[in-house]
């Protein structure tokens, strides 16, 4: 069985039926200035039962491509956010 990436981030948008937009933050060291900087990336995540709401912290796991940009599915809601 292949290794599946697990990402954790904040739901920033309900992108449509069964889809949420997830903002994932990572910290990297700048190559020249050696300062820790934040980098952000948005992922589209498949939410089969429309459980996630804007502001929630969720975990998503990689799966087969569901659409052109959507290849993660919702695993669990870690923390419910305040709308």
Swiss-Prot record:
Family from the record: Belongs to the universal ribosomal protein uS17 family.
Annotated PANTHER family: 40S RIBOSOMAL PROTEIN S11 FAMILY MEMBER, SMALL RIBOSOMAL SUBUNIT PROTEIN US17M
One Gene Ontology molecular-function label: rRNA binding
Function: One of the primary rRNA binding proteins, it binds specifically to the 5'-end of 16S ribosomal RNA.
Subunit structure: Part of the 30S ribosomal subunit.
Keyword rRNA-binding in record: yes
GO cellular component, one term: cytosolic small ribosomal subunit
Keywords noted in UniProt: Ribonucleoprotein, Ribosomal protein, RNA-binding, rRNA-binding
GO BP of this protein: translation
One protein family per Pfam: Ribosomal_S17
CDD domains: Ribosomal_uS17
Name of protein: Small ribosomal subunit protein uS17
Domain of life: Bacteria
InterPro entries the UniProt entry points to: NA-bd_OB-fold, Ribosomal_uS17, Ribosomal_uS17_bact/chlr, Ribosomal_uS17_CS
